[in-house]
Every structure is written in structure tokens, then in C-alpha cells.
């Protein structure tokens, strides 16, 4: 099965999350060991659940097509695979390059822990994308619409008791970069250090502030691949 959705803050008192796993083949069984392929760890689930309307029930077994809710303390990400031991990865759940960007800042220093936890869980849920600028260490949130910024701000305040403020940042495009030429990639990152960031997976992201800057980078560094989705 694979994790297709994560819902953060199911219980605000415990900041709990539920990862939803779609069973694709075989039979899922409670307390049976499963391989978390990305992490290479074996996991057991003593209280998997299924949701019916407002009711949540513990499930002992599930079959292809069923959706199982698994307790998540931060170990899952969307697209993760669970198997009986096979090394298997599902494809088709990429993150696309955002259209809008803003800096996010903690507006209440006394609530730093809540702010950090909220950002982590909301990003894991897929509400938006987070990039950390390697030049100044600032967090950049990328979305496809203005409403997502409002949702993040509302949920941080009402679910995590944290406040944020948004600050403008002029960016044109975020793209993931890779190269088989390690020397050229290193040279690119040094020359473009002001524009380099990391996503939540630790991958290199180029934050171009204009179409011209992006076009020139593509021309000057022929051996670097610029990806506009995270699946490559």
C-alpha cells in the first residue's frame, strides 16, 4: 500500500497525525510487520483505523481498495510505501513548482515550539511546500493560490496556538536541480548561492527570481537538469 494523505492535528491536545494508506494488493493485517521502504524500517500497527462518517473503528484486516488510517508521529510522507519486505516505490505523487511565494515568520517568539511543529505537520500534510533559503536561512512557503496562505495562518493560530506573519519575496520559479557532473553542480550552487534552497526532503532547489535568470542558468550550465516537479 502507499500513503496518499496525511491529516495533521487529529487530536489538538496531542498534536497527533493520521497517515492514510491505500491497500493496493495482498491483505493488510493488524500487528503484522511491514517494511517502510523509504526509511528501511520494520513497523507494526497495533491500532490501525477506518473512518465511517464521524466514527473511527479499529480494523483487524483490510483488502485492496480499502483505506487504513495509521498513527503517524512524523515517520510518513505522502507517497511512502509499505510492503511485506519488497523494495517497491510508487510513482505519480509529485510536488509541482509553486506559483506564489512568501516568507513565513514566527509572530510570537514565546510560541516557537508550537510554530515549528505546526509548520512541519502542515507541510507533511501537503498544504503547501516549504523551502529553506541556504543564504539567509529564511523559510519560503510556495503555493498555487492565495487561499493556501490564509489556510496556513488560520490553522497555525487555531490548531497550534501559534501566529505567523507573511513577508513578500520576489520569486519567479522554484525548480529542483541535479546533475551527473558533481563538479558542475557544485560550481552552480556556489555561483547561485543566494538563490539556493533545500526542500523538506533535503533536495537542492533553485529559486529563480525571474524568467531571465532561469533561462540564463539553463544556458550556462548545460549539464544540470532543472526539474519543475519533485518526481525525477
Predicted regions located by residue number:
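Conserved nucleotide-binding/hydrolysis modules and their immediate coupling elements
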Residues: 1-101, 116-117, 136-138, 191-194, ...
Amino acid at each position: 500500500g502507499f500513503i496518499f494523505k496525511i491529516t495533521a492535528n487529529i487530536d489538538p491536545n496531542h498534536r497527533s497525525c493520521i497517515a492514510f494508506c491505500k491497500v493496493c494488493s495482498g491483505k493488510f493485517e493488524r500487528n503484522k510487520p511491514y517494511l517502510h521502504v523509504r526509511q528501511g524500517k520494520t513497523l507494526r500497527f497495533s491500532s490501525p483505523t477506518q473512518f465511517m462518517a464521524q466514527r473511527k473503528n479499529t480494523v483487524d484486516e483490510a483488502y485492496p481498495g480499502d483505506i487504513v488510517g495509521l498513527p503517524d508521529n512524523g515517520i510518513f510522507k505522502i507517497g511512502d510505501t509499505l510492503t511485506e519486505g519488497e523494495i517497491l516505490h510508487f510513482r505519480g505523487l509529485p510536488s509541482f513548482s509553486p506559483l506564489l511565494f512568501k516568507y513565513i515568520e514566527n509572530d510570537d517568539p514565546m510560541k516557537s515550539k508550537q510554530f515549528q511543529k505546526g509548520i512541519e505537520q502542515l507541510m507533511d500534510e501537503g498544504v503547501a511546500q516549504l523551502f529553506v533559503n541556504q543564504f539567509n536561512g529564511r523559510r519560503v512557503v510556495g503555493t498555487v493560490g492565495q487561499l493556501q496562505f490564509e489556510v496556513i495562518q488560520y490553522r497555525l493560530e487555531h490548531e497550534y496556538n501559534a501566529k505567523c506573519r507573511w513577508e513578500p519575496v520576489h520569486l519567479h520559479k522554484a525548480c529542483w536541480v541535479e546533475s551527473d557532473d558533481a563538479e558542475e553542480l557544485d560550481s552552480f550552487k556556489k555561483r547561485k548561492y543566494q538563490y539556493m534552497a533545500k526542500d523538506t526532503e533535503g533536495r537542492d532547489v533553485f529559486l529563480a527570481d525571474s524568467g531571465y535568470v532561469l533561462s540564463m542558468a539553463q544556458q550556462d550550465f548545460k549539464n544540470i537538469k532543472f526539474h519543475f516537479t519533485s518526481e525525477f
